[in-house]
Amino acid sequence: QTQPGVYQRTSQVFEVTNTGNWSSKKYLPLGYIENTQAHTSLFWQIEHNGSWHYEIGDQNTHFYLCVSGPTEVQSHWFKNLAPGESFTSVPVAVGVTDDSFERAVGELTGYRRLIRRPNRDNENLPVIFNDYMNCLFGDPTTEKELPLIDAAAACGCEYYVIDAGWYAPGEWWDSVGEWQECRERFPNGIKEVTDYIRSKGMIPGVWLELEVMGINCEKAKNAPDDWFFVRHGRRVFDRSRYQLDFRNPAVISHVNEVIDRVVNE
């Protein structure tokens, strides 16, 4: 017997998925589609810094748009709810306008300005110099930093950030995780450099990537496996680094200790 038309569907979808905490690593968490016959457009964004998914398909002779955070099929994520429990999905925004991409982008921009958290940057956006891009590329030393600090101050910068590499000699990629200053790079300590930054009227900053430990980090070698993401009985690593599991209170204590030490010392 032929299925009634109202229940028919193709079982095909156009879908875009992002997995992980880098929410724009492959695609931006937004989309736009035009109806050229009706001269309308549909646009959307997913307001989430983790895994997300959207899809366009057909059901019961209608097209549908599904916009969401992580899913079980695409991201292997789910949440069981007991009777009386509830769960709020990640926030999304969906809008309709005429068939103008520029108009849709304008409406989305206006919406973003409305939902932005009030903060001092709205009125006073500081000028920040970071020593990584087009400068030291993760190879800082006292000798290299001082002339850059002078130049940044002369340009009117308000913050000066010492980026990656301050914590280890040589190739440091797979040994990060303890966040101790490297005396080979800063013979008199990194405080000499941060004090010099302050003497030039700027606020110092340092790069921290607290969510990872390199596979050759001594602390990672001595830490128990439950500090890290584990799959099939082994630590998960990507590009020679382990990912810390912040569900473990010991991991949070470690991170708090690092921040307190870096800020106060």
Q: What are these regions, as identified by a protein language model?
A:
Residues Q1-R112, R117:
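N-terminal accessory beta-strand-rich subdomains and adjacent acidic, glycine-rich linkers
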Residues N49, V94, Y132-N134, Y160, ...:
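Active-site beta-loop-alpha junctions enriched in small/polar residues
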Residues G84, F129, A152, Y160, ...:
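Conserved, mostly hydrophobic/aromatic
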Residues S89, L125-D131, E158-I162, P204-L208:
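Hydrophobic faces of well-ordered beta-strands that scaffold small-molecule active sites
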Residues N124-P126, C135-P140, R183, L210-E265:
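Active-site-adjacent "subsite" loops/lids of carbohydrate-active enzymes
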Residues K144-Y167, E265:
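Catalytic domains of carbohydrate-active enzymes, especially glycoside hydrolases
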Residues P147-D150, N188-S199, E257, R261:
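Alpha-helical scaffolding segments of alpha/beta enzyme cores, especially the outer helices
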Residues Y167-A220:
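Acidic/aromatic-lined carbohydrate-recognition and catalytic surfaces
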